[in-house]
Amino acid sequence: AEAMRRAAAVGKPIVAHCEVDELLKGGYIHDGVYCREHGHKGICSESEWRQVERDIKLAAETGCQYHVCHVSTKESVELIRRAKAAGLKVSGETAPHYLLLCDEDLQEDGRFKMNPPLRGREDREALRQAVADGTIEVIATDHAPHTAEQKSRGLAGSAMGIVGLECAFPLLYTYLVKPGLLTLEQLVERMSMAPRRIFGLGGGLQAGEP
C-alpha cells in the first residue's frame, strides 16, 4: 500500500508480475490435466489472480495507476474488467503464447516452460476475448531467451522463459488478425500505442521520442 501511495503522489504506475509465493508450492507448469496425467508439479491459477485481486483493492484505496504484466488466467481478466468498469486506473497485458497456446499443447520439452505457465483452454479463450474487447490493452512478448542447454532439461529442469521478439507480430497477425478476431489496426495499437499511452510516453514516431 505504501508503494502505491508514493507512486500515486508522483503520478507513476505500479507495474506487477502477480505471483503469490505461498501458492506456488514448487510448481512449474499449469495445474491442469497435462500436469496431473504426467506427474508434474503444478502452478494453480489462484497464485496469479489472488495478487491481482489484492492489488486492485489497494489501487482503489490509494488512487494509484496499476498495470498487470503477462496476464494468464480468466479470473485475472474478470478482475481487470470489473476494475475498469468501476473507473479505476487499471490496465493489463498479456503475451502471444497465452493467446495462441494452452496446456493442451504442452510437450516434454523445456521450450514449453515459462512463468506464468501456459494455462487452460478457457483461460486462452478469455484472454483472446479480452484483447479483442480492450479489457487487456497491451500485448508484450515477455521475451526471455536462454541457451539451448538451459532449455534442454525437460519441463522440470529447464529454465523458465520463452523467446518471442522475432515471431510475435507474424504469429499474432496470422492467428488473430487473419481469422478476424482483431483488425490490423487493433493489433498495432495493442503492441505499440497502448503501452506508450499507459506509461505516459506520448504517441507517434517522432525525432527525440523514446
What are these model-predicted stretches?
Residues 37-63, 112, 133, 137-139, ...:
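His/Asp/Glu-enriched, well-ordered alpha-helical/loop segment
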Residues 1-139:
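Histidine/acidic residue-rich metal-binding segments in metalloenzymes
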